[in-house]
Design a protein with these regions (language model features):
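Generic structural hydrophobic/aromatic packing signal, biased to beta-strands
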Residues: 6-10, 24, 86, 123
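Short acidic/polar mixed-charge low-complexity motifs
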Residues: 16-20
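Short acidic, Pro/Gly- and aromatic-enriched capping/linker segments at domain boundaries
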Residues: 1-15
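Short, proline-centered helix/strand-breaking motifs
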Residues: 21, 25-28
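Short, surface-exposed, charged amphipathic helix/loop patches that serve as local interaction elements
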Residues: 28-132
Length: 132
């Protein structure tokens, strides 16, 4: 990773995802701006202040709790499309013995809902929150 690369690597820690590494690649600014607008519409918030408040979890709150709080009351179809868009920017190193050997994410690579929540949370913190 260089100074201009905002990719983030996250270690899978839950169940069948334990030992896998997930890398969230940098998203181009135009795509990120469009994503943020779609996100605000899908989660039916009045504005970015509400999003910031939802994405600032209380101390000791689990990542999945924050994600589920964020998704409560959302347009399910729009939210699914946003999640699939997020996952286009995720790569996986599925073998713990080769933690740096990343490849494109496949549908069956994420086995645990908590891992999906961690990935979505990391994506929002590193790509969405700095943009708003």
């Amino acid at each position: 990773m260089n100074d201009y690369d905002s990719s983030v690597t996250l270690a899978g820690q839950h169940g069948r995802d334990n030992g896998k590494n997930f890398q969230i690649r940098e998203v181009p600014p135009v795509e990120m701006a469009t994503f943020i607008l779609r996100l605000l519409g899908a989660i039916r918030l009045e504005g970015v202040d509400e999003l910031r408040a939802l994405m600032t979890p209380a101390e000791g709150v689990d990542e999945i709790d924050t994600v589920l709080r964020l998704l409560a009351g959302c347009d399910a179809t729009a939210t699914r499309a946003l999640i699939l868009d997020v996952l286009k920017y995720v790569m996986v190193a599925p073998d713990p013995q080769h933690p740096g050997m990343f490849r494109a994410l496949r549908d069956d690579d994420i086995k645990e809902l908590r891992t999906l929540g961690d990935i979505i949370g990391a994506f929002v913190r590193t790509h969405v929150m700095p943009g708003i």
